[in-house]
UniProtKB/Swiss-Prot annotation:
GO terms for cellular component: small ribosomal subunit. The keyword GTP-binding does not apply. GO terms for biological process: translation. Part of the 30S ribosomal subunit. Contacts proteins S4 and S8. With S4 and S12 plays an important role in translational accuracy. GO terms for molecular function: rRNA binding; structural constituent of ribosome. Keywords: Ribonucleoprotein, Ribosomal protein, RNA-binding, rRNA-binding. Belongs to the universal ribosomal protein uS5 family. InterPro entries: Ribosomal_Su5_D2-typ_SF, Ribosomal_uS5, Ribosomal_uS5_bac-type, Ribosomal_uS5_C, Ribosomal_uS5_N, Ribosomal_uS5_N_CS, Ribsml_uS5_D2-typ_fold_subgr. The N-terminal domain interacts with the head of the 30S subunit; the C-terminal domain interacts with the body and contacts protein S4. The interaction surface between S4 and S5 is involved in control of translational fidelity. Residues 14-77 form the S5 DRBM domain. This is Small ribosomal subunit protein uS5.
Length: 169
């Protein structure tokens, strides 16, 4: 996969990052048909993040399709002063990611596709490790699955019928 780092600020206030562009080939009776597949993430810098894939005969069209799909598929993740509330694990296929909060000044310690997600969603301090498959598509999905599973202390307290102070100890 070609590593393409394109970051754009759109007028709607969303941060966009291209994770990669692949050239794919379909072999038919008359020869080969070349097209391009793009993977991108979009975030609002405040915990919102979405992932999109686009496929077209030309790179700019594939990139635009990926960005549009990412905008439509955004999810909201609660952040705790630029980091996460607790450690989470996400799995998609053979890709497994481990994500944990980090103290102020640590920065984003994560590889490739995960780093792009954290940058666009506004996370400034996080530790992340990818175990198993490092296929960008699966790593992005595993990361989003892990982030979806994260709960705030208020949500946990509400489920248990306790106060937030009791949960935090």
């Amino acid at each position: 996969m070609a590593k393409v780092e394109i970051e754009q600020q759109q007028t709607d206030g969303l941060r966009e990052k291209m994770i990669g562009v692949n050239r794919v080939t379909k072999v038919v009776k008359g020869g080969r048909i070349m097209s391009f597949a793009a993977l991108s993430v979009v975030g609002d810098g405040d915990g919102g993040v979405g992932m999109g894939k686009g496929k077209a005969r030309e790179v700019p069209v594939a990139v635009q399709k990926a960005m549009d799909e990412a905008r439509r598929s955004m999810i909201k993740v609660s952040l705790n002063n630029g980091t996460l509330y607790h450690a989470v694990t996400g799995v998609h296929g053979a890709a497994k990611v481990f994500i944990q909060p980090a103290s102020e000044g640590t920065g984003i310690i994560a590889g490739g596709a995960m780093r792009a997600i954290f940058e666009v969603m506004g996370v400034t301090n996080v530790l992340a490790k990818c175990i198993g498959s490092t296929n960008p598509y699966n790593v992005v999905r595993a990361t989003l699955n892990g982030l979806k599973s994260m709960n705030t202390p208020a949500e946990i307290a509400a489920k248990r019928g306790k106060s937030v102070e009791e949960i935090r100890g």
